[in-house]
């Protein structure tokens, strides 16, 4: 190797083997963007201080119960649609004890058109568990949280972080997409959370501001690093983003589009809409005739009854 180095100082030869000088100088590739290093993480946190939305459950003094309700409502539902129902719920049931005293059907009726009404049943069951097993206080421990009805890993982490300021790996789709792009150079995250993603995300959480990073990374993903039309020119960490530096390649994992029209999910939603505003119940025939396909309507009504969302007598359906 040393001889090669010494020979390089002599007359250069071209690739054709002649003694003519080589005119093309060697250039090093540009340095790889640093991704989500500690300085970039701090930049995201600083951006949030002046750009974060004033959502009601983020305000000082918000109870852990209010944070928990906001997280359950926000699952697969845009934040803008959650603010109104969340405000109404907190006025009506400001504590778990308040909701636990109600019938489950009352919670389902108040859920309105947020979608996925099973969440209302689970939230009611969660309130009962908190009232009876935790003296009406939302637990701050992650393991105790995931033992509650309807509380999974994400919601538990969000409550630990947003309600109690604890260190937790909060990974919603917005955070996962931000990490995939800025750190991994990939256009989007996989459809399902992987162990590698969780391990990578855990290493990014700063010790001095874990809760701030959780909410800031989520907000940047929701407002700037969006799924379909990311606003890279407005991004505070554009200079560190590996996906942007690579030219925003179309290299995201393939995602299967979820249909809506004509599905059982749409049918169940129509049936729930018919029954929700009639506390005394609706005739079974009226309920079934709200959907054009009788067999599908009967199947979906049976599913809603089996799941506890509706109650059916011989000729009436009610919450």
Model regions and ranges:
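Intrinsically disordered, low-complexity terminal tails and inter-domain linkers enriched
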Residues: 2-34
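Charge-rich, intrinsically disordered N-terminal extensions
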Residues: 26-62
